[in-house]
């Protein structure tokens, strides 16, 4: 564990991101960096994930949100980034497509199930829920979560629940929870430039379609 390097990297990133920001924004962003450094000392975070959280947090701070990172929601769930502005609560969960060794033979299914699990479990704690990802990764979000809840069926929700429960079963998610779970936005987080692009979920779905259409066809998934 190289705490000095971790802190140096985050401070360098924070300084680069905030070079033209107000002093208030700078102070808040560096405070987030310090929180992440303390979590790194406890071996709770890694630099690649922390860099994405920092850049995302800075974008929300600039929009007037009061931001926290690695915030505990209940006894089990800790969200990556949460922002509060007035009565609005926004949660952003980072998803980079990491596949553990045990899922090496079914990486696409594992990634899709993890994305579904994050939307189902975290969105109920937020007024708006977003997934944060990198420009080099395309999120394979089941269209179920992009459709309005009124257009979903219990059969669809049951299918999603079966897939999620294979990988994640705590906290338990009901079919009713799934019907209400919504992905509102995708945050494309470019650490290199320290910029964040916010895309509404339906627009992202259309953008991703050309990339994912063949992939879904060969996997035998339902047409979108």
Per-segment meaning from a language model:
Residues 65, 86-88, 124-129:
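Short glycine/proline-enriched coil/turn segments at helix->beta-strand junctions
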Residues 96-153:
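Catalytic cores of nucleic-acid endonucleases
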Residues 72-73, 135:
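Residue-level "edge-of-site" marker
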Residues 15-72:
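Acidic-basic catalytic patches of nuclease active cores, encompassing PD-(D/E)XK
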Residues 68-72, 78-80, 118-119, 174-175:
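Catalytic micro-motifs at enzyme active sites that drive phosphoryl/nucleotidyl and oxygen chemistry
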């Amino acid at each position: 564990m190289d705490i000095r390097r971790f802190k140096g990297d985050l401070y360098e990133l924070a300084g680069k991101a905030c070079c033209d920001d107000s002093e208030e924004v700078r102070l808040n962003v560096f405070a987030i960096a310090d929180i992440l450094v303390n979590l790194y000392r406890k071996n709770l975070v890694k630099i690649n994930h922390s860099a994405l959280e920092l850049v995302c947090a800075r974008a929300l701070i600039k929009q007037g949100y009061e931001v926290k990172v690695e915030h505990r929601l209940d006894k089990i769930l800790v969200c990556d980034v949460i922002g509060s502005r007035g009565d609005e609560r926004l949660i952003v969960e980072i998803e980079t497509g990491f596949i553990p060794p045990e899922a090496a033979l079914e990486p696409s299914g594992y990634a899709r199930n993890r994305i579904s699990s994050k939307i189902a479990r975290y969105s109920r704690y937020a007024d708006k829920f977003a997934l944060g990802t990198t420009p080099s990764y395309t999120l394979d979000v089941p269209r179920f979560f992009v459709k309005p809840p009124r257009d979903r069926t219990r059969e669809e929700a049951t299918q999603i629940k079966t897939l999620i429960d294979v990988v994640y079963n705590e906290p338990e998610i009901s079919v009713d929870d799934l019907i209400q779970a919504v992905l509102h936005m995708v945050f494309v987080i470019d650490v290199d430039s320290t910029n964040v692009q916010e895309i509404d979920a339906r627009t992202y779905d259309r953008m991703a379609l050309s990339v994912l259409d063949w992939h879904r066809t060969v996997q035998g998934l339902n047409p979108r």
